[in-house]
Every structure is written in C-alpha cells, then in structure tokens.
Amino acid sequence: MERDLTYNAPKIKFTDTEGQEEHFYFNRSNNSTNDLTSHDSSSTQLQDANSRRQAPPPPPHNPFSDNSHENSTESLYQSETRFHQPLLHNDSNNSNSSIGNNRQRIPSQQHDTSSLYSASPISTSPLVSNFQSYSDNQDEMTRGKYNQNTNRSSSNYIQHSPTSAGYDRYPLKTQSSIGGSMSRIGLSSSSPSQQQQQHMYDNNSSNRSSYSPDSATDLMVYENGEFSPFGGYPASLFPLSIDEKEPDDYLHNPDPVQDAEYDKNRFLYDLKTMDKKSMNGLIAFIVMFLIAIAIFIILPVFTYTGYNPKAKNFENYEVLTRYSYPRLSAIRTSLIDPDTPEDALFWKSKNGEEWPLVFSDEFNAEGRTFYEGDDQFFTAPDLHYDATKDLEWYDPDAVTTANGTLTLRMDAFKNHGLFYRSGMIQSWNQMCFTQGKLEFSAKLPGYGNITGFWPGLWSMGNLGRPGYLASTEGVWPYTYDSCDAGITPNQSSPDGISYLPGQRLNKCTCPGEAHPNRGVGRGAPEIDALEGEIHGVIGRVSQSLQVAPYDIWYMPNYDFLEIHNSSITLMNTYAGGPFQQAISGVTMLNVTWYEYGDHQHNFQKYGYEYLNDDESGYLRWFVGDNPTFTIYSQALHPNGNVGWRKLPKEPLSLILNFGISNNWAYIDWPSLVFPSTMRVDYVRVYQPKDQINVGCDPTDFPTYDYIQQHLNVYQNVNLTKFEDGGYTFPKHKLIGC
C-alpha cells in the first residue's frame, strides 16, 4: 500500500519559466497527493503564467530499458504497469498535440500517489511524481464555463547510470538551464472537463497509456545538489516533518503534563470516552453493588430491629414470666397447643368439677431443638446431674421431636469424661403453674423387666433450678412457713435426721436480707409424677411428694393417706433420708408400656392432681385415668420440734429426664440395650376455673426479682454451694438480726 506523503504538507513555493513565483498548497482531500491548489485566486496571473510556459524537451534515452522502444519514458511506464492500474489517455482538449514519443504517466485517481518506480528486483523507489493542479475562474464557473489551461511541460528528467543492472534507486538529476543551479519538477494541470474525460476513458481502456503535451506543469525550485533519499524530492521539502502533528503522535510523543492530568482524573476521562458496552458493564456493576448492600446490610438491620411498616393486630396472651430471652423460636401465642384434641380440653377433678386446660404441648412439630433460647417453654440443659450422681451427661443433642413425640435418647457415648449421654428438658423460669392437674403421656425406655434405667417426669419449685446445686441449697425440698427449729441446720437435732443447711428463705428473715417476699417461708418442693424402676421381673412407678423439714423417722400421719387399689399400689418402704422426706407410693406397670418386648408398645398416662389449701388440700396421683393414692394436707401436721408442712404453694416448673444411676436402682449392665429412648406424647395442665395460676412469678409467691439478684447460682452449674456464688445466707430472728 502506497503511503500518502502529503499529510500535513508545508506550503511549497513554485516558479514558472519566467521566474514568477506562485504559492501552492498540497490538496489534503481524499488523502491524495495528486492535486495542488493555488493560493493566488487571480485568473489574470494564471493566464500570464500559462502563456510563458514552453513545451518540455524530449526525455533522454534510457540505455538500460528492457524494451527496445525508443521512448525511454514509455519504457519506464510499461515496466511499471504491473504495479498500477491502467492510465488515462488525456486527449480531450488537445487533439492536435504532439503525442509522439513524449509520453508521461497521468496519475490514476484511484491511488493516493502517482509515481514511477524503477523495476528493482528488490524494492521500488519513486522516480517521478506528477502533480495535477488546476485553477478555476470564479466568474466563468458561474456561467458554466471552465478555463482550459495549457499543459505545463516538466523540465525534471532523470538520467540513469549506464552501469546499473536495472533502474537506479537514487537517480541523478538533469538540471534545467533556468535558474543556474535550480532544478525543476514538472507539475501537470488539467481542467475539470479533462479529468472527467479521463475517468470516462478509464472505463473503456484499461491497458492504454497516453499523455497530452498540452497538460501544463509547474516547476518546484530547490537547492542544487541537496541529497534526497526519497527518489526525486529534496530532503528539505519532504512533506512529513518531525515537528508536524499526526493523529498517532500521542502514542510515541508522551506529554508529561497531559499524562499527569489524565492520571489525576482518570475516572472522569474514562467515563467521557466510555463505549456502550463498557457503560452497560458499569451500570450492571452498580446494580449488583446496590443489591448486595440491600441483602447483606439493610435486610439484616431490619430483621434484627424487627422493623415492619405494616401494623399488626396482636392477640392477647398470658405472661408466663418477665424474663427476657434472646430468641423465641416457638411460634405459639397461646399456652394451649392447637394440636390438642377437643376431648382433652377439660379434666374432671376429684370433687367432680371440670377444670379447663390451661397449658399443653403435643410435641407434634418435627425437629424441635431445645438449646438455650431455642424453645418457648422448655430448655435442654448441658450438664452432669451431680445431685444424684448420675452416670450420664445431659446433652441437648439427645433431645428432639419426631413422629409426634418428644424423644430423650440414651447412648453408650462418651461425653465429658462420662460413658453415657442422655437428655433432659425443663421449663424452669419459662412455664410454671400453681395447683391443678399435671398429666404426661409417655412410653418408658428399655424392657419392662430389666432394671437399671431411671426415667423421670416431675416438677419442682421455681426458686431452685434442677441440676444447679448452688441454687437448690437451702430451698429444696422446703415447703415450710414457720419460724422454729425446722428452719435451722439439721433441724437442730444431733441424731442426724437431717443434713440440710436450714431453710434459706424462711419466714423470720431479718429486715434488709435478700428474700423474695419477706415474712413468708419459701422453698422448692418436689412432686414426682413418675420415677421408673423395676421390682423383680416387673416394672413399677414411684410417685411421691418430697418435703422438708422432716417428721420423726420420716413418717407422716398415714391416717390421712388413701390407697385406691391395694392390689397394684402400696406405700413405698423408702420414706426418706438425711436430704429429703418422701411420701411415696409405688404402682405396678404393664410390660406393654415399655419400648422393647414381644408385645405392643403403648403410651400410658402418669400425673397428679392437687389443691394446696391448708384445711382441705390434697395431692392425688394417677396411672392412666385411675388414681393410685392420695395424701391430704392434715398428714403433714406438726411433729416433734417442727410445725406444719404445706402442700406446695410455690409455682412449679416441669422436668422430663432419662437418667441412669447406682443411687437409684441396681443396674443390670449385660441386659440393658443401648440406645434406648424415652418418648413423651404430650404434657397437659388443668386448673380450677376460679384458681387459674400459670406463670413462674405469681404475685403472692414471686420469684423473678430474686432470681435476677442471684443469677450466678442459677447460671453456673459448677457451683455447689450458695456462698460459692458470692452470696451469704440471710440472717433470721432465731440467730439474731
């Protein structure tokens, strides 16, 4: 591809044969170097210059031409035709001109440059450049006429060295006599009509070349003998100079100031010159960034703060406790489970009254977990139950709900240095009740004739947290409202009847001492609906009330106890010990109520019903719908140096656990099966219509404030003494205030 050498070409001075100077500029239109436009618009000067032009002499003979034709210029042209398109024959206005052997190549308008090249076997070099120019008379153009200029003959001829095997790359100049030391390069000029005819002729003849001697030429003057590496142009007039600007100058001519400005404002410059594709990418990135902000920042903020622009109509619900939990996973707003069947909404009491259901949990939701804060009503502790020297570790992982039941699973799984793992849930400080009917439906673990397991369904006063020994010291299992020897350590008896430290929250606590409601004896009594054991080859359940202080020999007044079916129920031979008095009865169980065995595996109901009135109160236990035995409030009358023990008036929390301990029963290790699971179908609580009292912080027996003031003993399971939590036993009147 030929290079356009006239880009940003300088102004060139031309001189005609008479020495008259004319000023021309290279025409930059269409990237062509063929036309030169005169800056002098005077038609008179142009006509005078044309009249002074003379026809050029014939070019010298080229002895190195491969063509035998006498015209060397034509030979040059013919040798070059394989590199260029056919030339036009300019004979439109000068039909009588002498064509003869004086032919010059007329530049093709389809090329940027029109030059003759030597047929060098290696490269081609420009030999002669023919420039076309024409001037228009403005007045004649208006009238539709053109000024036909006479052809300007070129006086620039090239003489080749006879020693060259081909065309010389840097030919010698044959200088004109005009100007002495000046050489002239011919410039051809033709009228617009001639150019039009040349174009028409080019369509008819592609191989014919001719030249009209009438085409005018101008002479470009330059210093004699100046070396030119460009084959005909002097170096001083080469149109491309290092000082001239080109479109690609910014690639190899860095501008420190402009570059610094660009680096400083790179983003703005790139933004201004950004194409459509890049702009779409930027918009997509911004949209994705905003979406990420909304998902990972705004949404979590709204979720954490509970923001909701929509108004909610909250249902009324009963407040169980003022304790604030970190997270409420249960979705219930009622204490009664909506899955509870309608025929279980009422219970017929001992006196024939119908008590409504006030709380239930059917455990029908699959996959419930009971880690701290997971559930609305129950929590599975993560601890070792050291109070009874259990052999298992209670782990929340062992507790879940499946197939409509709560499952407490015991595995031979090493955990915290113990060889067994099992589960417990408790409603301490979450769900409590005072008076009423408590009912569990459960399937006991293992076989009905293999001893070792210790399943339990029971309740305890909310002032003591099961498994936290520091919290139960001095309150379990006290249910006492007197100020006598019963509140003192060991009941002030040297015979070892009691190892208890005394009632911590007694009736006669000194003013200013810590107490939930000073003037009332408080404690954490225990009522067991079920403690499973095996007697011989048959299972049985122990149901009991555990109280303090104790009767002499732990014997209540049995005149106020009633056994309803002596064929299956009898009083327990174990009546208590140094740490508690147990009014207990045992009832035989059916082997079909256990997990394993060659028989049906059914659920059975276990529970109790009680009223805590001092005169007419009672406590009755049940297996199924049948009562087993009943204790009346008069059975706990004053005895020895202690006064009345009360049927529990404390709010009672619920405990469901599956343990194993040598302190409870003989363990038949070879016969036990692991894993074994205790399943609970439901828990239900009924209360008299006029005495509904659900909650862990009732007005007459509050617990919340006291627990908050002594959180250390309720949250640190490793504390075994109340004083270990940083507290002291309150003083009372018997020892002085």
UniProtKB/Swiss-Prot annotation:
GO terms for biological process: (1->6)-beta-D-glucan biosynthetic process; fungal-type cell wall organization. Keywords: Cell wall biogenesis/degradation, Glycoprotein, Membrane, Signal-anchor, Transmembrane, Transmembrane helix. Residues 27-53, 103-136, 145-164 have a biased composition (Polar residues). It is a single-pass type II membrane protein. Residues 348-691 form the GH16 domain. Required for synthesis of the major beta-glucans of the cell wall. This is Beta-glucan synthesis-associated protein SKN1.
